[in-house]
């Protein structure tokens, strides 16, 4: 296929769009791949659509290879299936809801577990029909509170979601393993640098869950890796090693002190050391203090907010993402001034677990807050703290919670050294859902003994449109994009940079011969555009190979440019053969 730039629907830009913050957003707009329609909503222009279709094809090939069968559900869905699983309320404000002219409730699909489960129920009834894997590549909708970074975090996006149905848990594990391997092949073929991380299941439910994160400094997700092992996890899924329980007998009684200048952890530690408080024979450190963070939570469908106290060691900050993941599907917000005014027992800066428990507030503690540990914390009175408050004696948490920040150098699980932190972009997520959705829809199948059984599900998602932005993040330089051959809209960009008639005719011939060899060609045949502009556009658009017919053509040579790599002079009669070989090698 040959596409001529003289007729291609394209306008490149020299300046970054005003609302763009990350490289992928800037370059995809400047290069004419996408165009903003509304916050978080983008049009796909011809070049962008070709690249998107190439990604879809790689995904489709690998899904078909593991026995997946493609179908397509509507994006406009009725309320009832999502009421059955309670996700009509659990999704909260992120769900696009609408009514038809008769007043019936509908939604724009954020994900389709309900549709897959109910369809299998309607069509299959015997164990002989299983296992089965179904998938679709389809547009999804989520009302992101803060859409950002172009198509990295949009409100409309293309996703591949697949679902496996097995009669046994062992079968689910096999389906999960097949999808995991297929995802690795997909991301390897696309040329993405990624990490497989342990993850939380969130609103999806289920047991085992892993994320595929593309390594990127601009990623919204933080993940950790062990220095001496293969452990990797999204920071939300990191489990804190519990503290060592201690005997309570013999510990000194808790004492309340006046602390007029100790509203911060730093001043509290300084005060404690100034009056000679010690811990195990040493000076007090921030980790000996206990922060009591007050948050409010609201369960799906509820109108009222409820207070919750979150206890973390004073040397740690609360990580809101970890906190939200631990309390999901409830909404979570930090308590604000109005809440402190509403509840007089909340003394800002001096809240402690005793006062919260006394007033019926749920208290959740960091796993390090175990029986026998002694703390310095708020005494629930202005300018007062308590020293020697012992867990299991003076207060007992209602449960434990993963809410404290994870830091570089924290111990890794199972003795795998320490943790290092990095940023990433979620590109895939796989779940062993189990029977949450098949039970909700009463999917009953007759097993080989003629008894009714409920199949188990796996759920597997890939952010297809996000992959284009991820590749742009990972594969670009100051001049522009640098696509891998599997994704590039065209493999070769032929540039006629010489106005000599013979050179222009040769460029036409090269484009035709490359096309006949099965290579997609973008041909810059624009007659009134300078060579300099053509070269800049070629670098901005980012095709893997560029064939330049310039001044050297009269001397029997053309120039081959590998995007982001070498420039080579080739004899005119060897150009096509060389490029075909290089493209085929790059395709693998």
Swiss-Prot record:
Cellular component GO terms held in the UniProt record: cytosol
Gene Ontology annotations of biological process type: prolyl-tRNA aminoacylation
UniProt key word NAD: no
Pfam entry (one): tRNA-synt_2b
UniProt keyword terms in alphabetical order: Aminoacyl-tRNA synthetase, ATP-binding, Cytoplasm, Ligase, Nucleotide-binding, Protein biosynthesis
An annotated Gene Ontology molecular function: aminoacyl-tRNA deacylase activity
Domain of life: Bacteria
CDD domains: ProRS_anticodon_short (cd00861), ProRS_core_prok (cd00779)
Location(s) in or outside the cell: Cytoplasm
Listed InterPro entries: aa-tRNA-synt_IIb, aa-tRNA-synth_II, aa-tRNA-synth_II/BPL/LPL, Anticodon-bd, Anticodon-bd_dom_sf, Pro-tRNA-ligase_IIa, Pro-tRNA-synth_IIa_bac-type, Pro-tRNA-Synthase_IIa_type1
Main localization of the protein described in the UniProt heading: cytoplasm
Catalysed reactions, as listed in the record: tRNA(Pro) + L-proline + ATP = L-prolyl-tRNA(Pro) + AMP + diphosphate
Keyword Protein biosynthesis attributed: yes
Principal EC category: ligase
EC number of the protein: 6.1.1.15
PROSITE patterns per UniProt: AA_TRNA_LIGASE_II
Assembly mode: Homodimer.
PANTHER family xrefs: MITOCHONDRIAL RIBOSOME PROTEIN L39/PROLYL-TRNA LIGASE FAMILY MEMBER, PROLINE--TRNA LIGASE
Family according to the record: Belongs to the class-II aminoacyl-tRNA synthetase family. ProS type 1 subfamily.
Primary role: Catalyzes the attachment of proline to tRNA(Pro) in a two-step reaction: proline is first activated by ATP to form Pro-AMP and then transferred to the acceptor end of tRNA(Pro). As ProRS can inadvertently accommodate and process non-cognate amino acids such as alanine and cysteine, to avoid such errors it has two additional distinct editing activities against alanine. One activity is designated as 'pretransfer' editing and involves the tRNA(Pro)-independent hydrolysis of activated Ala-AMP.
Domain comment, as recorded: Consists of three domains: the N-terminal catalytic domain, the editing domain and the C-terminal anticodon-binding domain.
Name the record gives this protein: Proline--tRNA ligase
Gene name of the record: proS
């Amino acid at each position: 296929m040959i596409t001529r730039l003289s007729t291609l629907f394209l306008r490149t830009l020299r300046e970054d769009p005003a609302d763009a913050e990350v490289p992928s957003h800037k370059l995809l707009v400047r290069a004419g791949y996408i165009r903003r329609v509304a916050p978080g909503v983008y049009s796909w222009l011809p070049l962008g659509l070709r690249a998107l279709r190439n990604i879809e094809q790689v995904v489709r090939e690998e899904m078909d290879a593991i026995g997946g069968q493609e179908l397509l559900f509507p994006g406009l869905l009725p309320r009832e299936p999502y009421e059955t699983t309670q996700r009509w309320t659990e999704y909260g404000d992120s769900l696009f809801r609408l009514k038809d002219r008769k007043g019936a409730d509908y939604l724009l699909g954020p994900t389709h577990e309900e549709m897959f489960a109910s369809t299998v129920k309607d069509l299959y009834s015997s164990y002989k029909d299983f296992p089965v894997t179904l998938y679709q590549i389809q547009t999804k909708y989520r009302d992101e509170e803060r859409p950002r970074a172009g198509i990295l975090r949009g409100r409309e996006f293309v996703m591949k979601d697949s679902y496996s149905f097995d009669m046994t848990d062992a079968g689910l594990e096999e389906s999960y393993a097949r999808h995991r391997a297929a995802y690795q092949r997909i991301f390897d073929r696309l040329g993405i640098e990624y990490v497989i991380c342990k993850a939380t299941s969130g609103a999806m439910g289920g047991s085992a869950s892993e994320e595929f994160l593309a390594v990127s400094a601009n990623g919204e997700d933080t993940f950790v890796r062990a220095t001496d092992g293969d452990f990797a996890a999204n920071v939300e899924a990191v489990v804190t090693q519990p503290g060592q329980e201690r005997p309570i007998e013999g510990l000194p009684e808790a004492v309340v002190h006046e602390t007029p200048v100790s509203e911060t952890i730093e001043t509290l530690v300084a005060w404690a050391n100034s009056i000679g408080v010690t811990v195990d024979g040493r000076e007090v450190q921030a980790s000996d203090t206990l922060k009591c963070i007050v948050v409010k939570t609201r369960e799906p469908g509820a109108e009222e907010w409820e207070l919750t106290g979150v206890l973390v060691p004073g040397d740690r900050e609360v990580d809101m993402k970890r906190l939200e993941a631990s309390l999901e599907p409830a909404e979570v917000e930090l308590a604000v001034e109005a809440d402190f005014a509403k509840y007089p027992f909340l003394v800002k800066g001096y809240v402690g677990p005793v006062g919260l428990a006394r007033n019926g507030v749920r208290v959740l503690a960091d796993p390090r807050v175990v029986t026998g540990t002694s703390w310095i914390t708020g005494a629930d009175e202005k300018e007062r703290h308590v020293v020697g408050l012992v867990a299991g004696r003076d207060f007992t948490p209602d449960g434990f919670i993963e809410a404290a920040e994870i830091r570089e150098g924290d111990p890794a699980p199972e003795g795998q050294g320490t943790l290092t932190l990095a940023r990433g972009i979620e590109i895939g997520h796989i779940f062993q859902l189990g029977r949450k959705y098949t039970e909700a829809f009463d999917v009953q199948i007759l097993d080989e003994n003629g008894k009714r059984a409920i199949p188990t599900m796996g759920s597997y998602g890939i952010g297809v449109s996000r992959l284009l932005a991820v590749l742009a993040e990972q594969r670009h330089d100051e001049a522009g994009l640098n696509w891998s051959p599997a994704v590039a809209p065209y493999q070769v960009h032929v540039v006629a940079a010489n106005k000599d008639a013979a050179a222009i005719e040769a460029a036409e011939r090269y484009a035709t011969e490359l096309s006949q060899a099965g290579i997609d060609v973008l041909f810059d045949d624009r007659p009134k555009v300078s060579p300099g502009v053509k070269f800049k556009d070629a670098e901005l658009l980012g095709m893997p190979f560029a064939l330049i017919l310039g001044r050297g053509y009269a001397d029997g040579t053309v120039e081959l440019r590998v995007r982001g790599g070498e420039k080579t002079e080739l004899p005119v009669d060897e150009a096509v053969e060389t490029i075909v070989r290089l493209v085929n090698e790059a395709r693998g």
